[in-house]
Amino acid sequence: WRDAPSFFNYITRCQSFLQMGRPDNDFLIYLPVYDMWNEQPGRLLLFTIHHMDKLAPKFIDAIHRINNSGYDGDYISDNFIRSTRFKDGQLVTSGGTGYKALVVPAAHLMPSDVLTHLYELAKQGATIVFLENYPTDVPGYGQVEQKRQSYQRTLRQLPAVSFSETTVTPIGKGKIITGTDYARTLASCNIS
């Protein structure tokens, strides 16, 4: 195809401009993939971004509620949470992008080391938001009792709150915010 070199040069130029930009979303939003897999019937565990409304209706509802509250966010997985740090007043991902807070929307399953890392980030100065509930258990069956014990130790360190009210609890240099009213709870992050 004779136009291919020109077309590829155009794509290269466009990509260069796109890569010069910086994301400016307000929040990191925890992607509860273990909840999604747990709720899928059968043994074929697929993850396709184009059918999220069918695979994860609760998560998509939470995303709509966050967006309708006037905020936007980027999804983050367990693996990327593990490498996220708190630096210069922001949560910074391994890619170097900074965010003002991390939101966990109504997740039920979360690895114990991820919950512990979120608590440590709050102690360092980060804002961590739990909407509707704290996660209640760890995923999987490998070393499940050991993981549950570790999980329960961290869970006992989190503020004992009624999620029916928006609560801001100082944790070290940061804070943990809890609640079920998305607009009010997210507004407590003081992000404009």
Outline where the language-model segments fall:
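Carbohydrate-binding surfaces of carbohydrate-active enzymes
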Residues: 1-192
